[in-house]
Swiss-Prot record:
Matching HAMAP family: UPF0434 (MF_01187)
Sequence intervals crossing the membrane: none
Protein family (similarity comment): Belongs to the UPF0434 family.
InterPro entries: Trm112-like
Source taxonomy: Bacteria, Pseudomonadati, Pseudomonadota, Alphaproteobacteria, Rickettsiales
Source organism of the structure: Anaplasma marginale (strain St. Maries)
Signal peptide: none
The protein, known as: UPF0434 protein AM070
UniProt-listed PANTHER family: PROTEIN PREY, MITOCHONDRIAL, ZGC:162634
SUPFAM superfamilies attached to this UniProt entry: Trm112p-like
């Protein structure tokens, strides 16, 4: 789980854009950067090298 107050102040380290928390995958997602940053024991790992690339939306 991620502290709600922390989520309010964090931004994507690459774009400066908004992040949202995906509780199912325990990741902070930056749609603008196309990356998902892992959260380990409530601590976000905000390193681009550690982030997972998001799959393109194929709607």
């Amino acid at each position: 789980m991620l502290d709600k107050r922390l989520l309010e102040v964090l931004v994507c380290p690459l774009t400066g854009g908004e992040l949202y928390y995906d509780a199912d995958s325990c990741e902070l997602v930056s749609e603008n950067a196309g990356l998902a940053f892992p959260v380990h024991d409530g601590i976000p790992v905000m390193l681009a090298d550690e982030a997972r690339k998001l799959e393109p939306d194929t709607k």
